[in-house]
């Protein structure tokens, strides 16, 4: 558990809670994680994401949007990490349901599988879907910790370090409580 600016972490990869266009936040000076990561990484990250999405648009159709729960790897560019793994978390519009919880599990699982596939031994997770996407913070933290714990039972030797990065004090308290069970 680490509290602070994820864009300052030296890790194999950091996780970006991306939007479905995967081109970064379009609101100048917005305080979301997507904007923070794209701003710190530099224009090269936005350009790589644009190339990826253009290729997928040619393959799947012009209006292609990245599905919820997938993981896409890019370079870290001006960040101290080697890579950024982008995942689109579920958006909670009304009540939380099992499908949204499974979508969030898929985000964590697919990011971890991406790490294994690409020999990335350390990863820092942001709090996926809890900000602009309105996933309840405590439930999101439970899902994150449970999914990572299940993954480590199967692939523990593949990873050296998994960090849960929080920005707010309230999220730190939630994670400390949940992680004390493991």
Regions found by a protein language model. Give the residues of each.
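Macrodomain-like recognition of ADP-ribose-binding/processing modules
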Residues: 1-182
């Amino acid at each position: 558990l680490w509290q602070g600016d994820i864009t300052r972490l030296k890790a194999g990869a950091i996780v970006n809670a991306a939007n479905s266009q995967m081109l970064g936040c379009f609101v100048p000076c917005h305080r979301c994680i997507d904007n923070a990561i794209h701003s710190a990484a530099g224009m090269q990250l936005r350009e790589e994401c644009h190339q990826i999405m253009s290729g997928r648009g040619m393959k799947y159709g012009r209006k292609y949007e990245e599905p919820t729960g997938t993981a896409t790897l890019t370079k870290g560019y001006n960040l101290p990490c080697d890579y950024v793994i982008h995942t689109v978390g579920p958006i909670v519009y009304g009540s939380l349901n099992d499908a949204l919880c499974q979508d969030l599990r898929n985000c964590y699982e697919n990011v971890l599988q991406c790490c294994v596939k690409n020999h990335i031994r350390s990863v820092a997770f942001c709090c996926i879907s809890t900000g602009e996407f309105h996933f309840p913070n405590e439930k999101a933290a439970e899902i994150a910790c449970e999914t990572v714990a299940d993954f480590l039972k199967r692939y523990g030797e593949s990873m050296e370090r998994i960090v849960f990065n929080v920005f707010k004090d309230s999220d730190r308290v939630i994670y400390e409580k949940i992680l004390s069970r493991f």
